[in-house]
Amino acid sequence: MREILHIQGGQCGNQIGAKFWEVICDEHGVDATGRYAGDSDLQLERINVYYNEASGGRYVPRAVLMDLEPGTMDSVRSGPFGQIFRPDNFVFGQSGAGNNWAKGHYTEGAELIDSVLDVVRKEAENCDCLQGFQVCHSLGGGTGSGMGTLLISKIREEYPDRMMLTFSVFPSPKVSDTVVEPYNATLSVHQLVENADECMVLDNEALYDICFRTLKLATPTFGDLNHLISATMSGVTCCLRFPGQLNSDLRKLAVNLIPFPRLHFFMVGFAPLTSRGSQQYRALTVPELTQQMWDAKNMMCAADPRHGRYLTASAMFRGKMSTKEVDEQMLNVQNKNSSYFVEWIPNNVKSSVCDIPPRGLKMAATFVGNSTSIQEMFRRVSEQFTAMFRRKAFLHWYTGEGMDEMEFTEAESNMNDLVAEYQQYQDATADEEYEDEEEEAEAE
């Protein structure tokens, strides 16, 4: 039933992915050997969304792990849940992509892609009714961005009617891991706009801020950051895996969140975020969850929703709560902050309620919003891109792998178009839309 195939690529993707499987295994009561050690039938009822049941009652994740160098995969394999994955599903090269998008997309990655697709095919054939794919990757490096987008376009060709959801880590505004990040990210966005159905936009700086300010961690590690991401990833699919009063799935999410096909880049948030020591001092209520969930400080990407307007949003609650209260709170948010929602999409917040909360919490909520302010992310990357591209800095690394400058120009203009589209809908009002139509009618 409604399986989701998980794919992780590159160092970032594999580290997020490894953390994600720790969270999912914990929710479904699966131990590090793949045996079920849980205490509730609900954990098993739809465990097959993310797991295959192998011989001897072992649960094996429907996961494909790929990288162009063996390093990160070795550490996944030796990590806490490393033995749970199917050994054949580790696909890796030896050369590395060296933070070069062209290597990941055209040369090194292209050599490895067929063996990855074989594994994907094998996993898809094991599914009863595949719902879609979720891909974890970063856009700043070489493998996750270059090879990740190559894989997405290949899967698109082969499974055109399945959902394609990505968790994409964008380059951060202040912290840069790589000088050529703006190039890699722009080339990737150029692909994601065309080939992905839903992109959850993440970035490390926003995650650091959450760890630092809200969770009060003095020195946040990547492990802490990835744990935040995993909580959100688990929240997005909890309705598929546990019974609930109001269900959502990847396709419902897309239908409710995407008013125009290109505008499918979402901000995500999670509540409750409390610092490790202070959990036991407060009970959570739906109003508190709602308040934290819509808080700008809670967003996992460096764009401020107060600088734009929400086209649509979706709130996924988990735990025992009254749906009436959820509906009231959602209505309340829209009424109080009506200036932050576009008025030409009435009732633009979708909510869903799943009965089973995450481990250790009474209730929780995941937020996914389609806000025009996400253009800040693209605008920032685009400015950095233009600054380097104008001088043709670092281009020889890409042209040397057979890329053409034209492709850079196309990617740049596609990204600028995307920013312009977001801006256009941010400024649009209900009345002027109507006037446009009248003028068109007269012109005809």
Swiss-Prot record:
It holds the Pfam family Tubulin. GTP binds at Q11, E69, S138, G142, T143, G144, N204, N226. InterPro entries: Beta-tubulin_BS, Beta_tubulin, Tub_FtsZ_C, Tubulin, Tubulin/FtsZ-like_C, Tubulin/FtsZ_2-layer-sand-dom, Tubulin/FtsZ_GTPase_sf, Tubulin_C. The lineage of its organism: Eukaryota, Viridiplantae, Streptophyta, Embryophyta, Tracheophyta. Keywords: Cytoplasm, Cytoskeleton, GTP-binding, Magnesium, Metal-binding, Microtubule, Nucleotide-binding. Gene3D superfamilies: Helix hairpin bin, Tubulin/FtsZ, C-terminal domain, Tubulin/FtsZ, GTPase domain. Signal peptide: none annotated. It comes from the Eukaryota. This is Tubulin beta-7 chain. Dimer of alpha and beta chains. A typical microtubule is a hollow water-filled tube with an outer diameter of 25 nm and an inner diameter of 15 nM. Alpha-beta heterodimers associate head-to-tail to form protofilaments running lengthwise along the microtubule wall with the beta-tubulin subunit facing the microtubule plus end conferring a structural polarity. Microtubules usually have 13 protofilaments but different protofilament numbers can be found in some organisms and specialized cells. Tubulin is the major constituent of microtubules, a cylinder consisting of laterally associated linear protofilaments composed of alpha- and beta-tubulin heterodimers. Microtubules grow by the addition of GTP-tubulin dimers to the microtubule end, where a stabilizing cap forms. Below the cap, tubulin dimers are in GDP-bound state, owing to GTPase activity of alpha-tubulin. It comes from Oryza sativa subsp. japonica. GO terms for cellular component: cytoplasm; microtubule. GO terms for molecular function: GTP binding; GTPase activity; metal ion binding; structural constituent of cytoskeleton. Induction: By gibberellin. Down-regulated by abscisic acid (ABA). GO terms for biological process: microtubule cytoskeleton organization; mitotic cell cycle. Expressed in roots, leaf sheaths, and suspension cultured cells. The keyword Cytoplasm applies. Belongs to the tubulin family. Its cofactor is Mg(2+). Mg(2+) binds at E69. It is found in: Cytoplasm, Cytoskeleton. The gene is TUBB7.
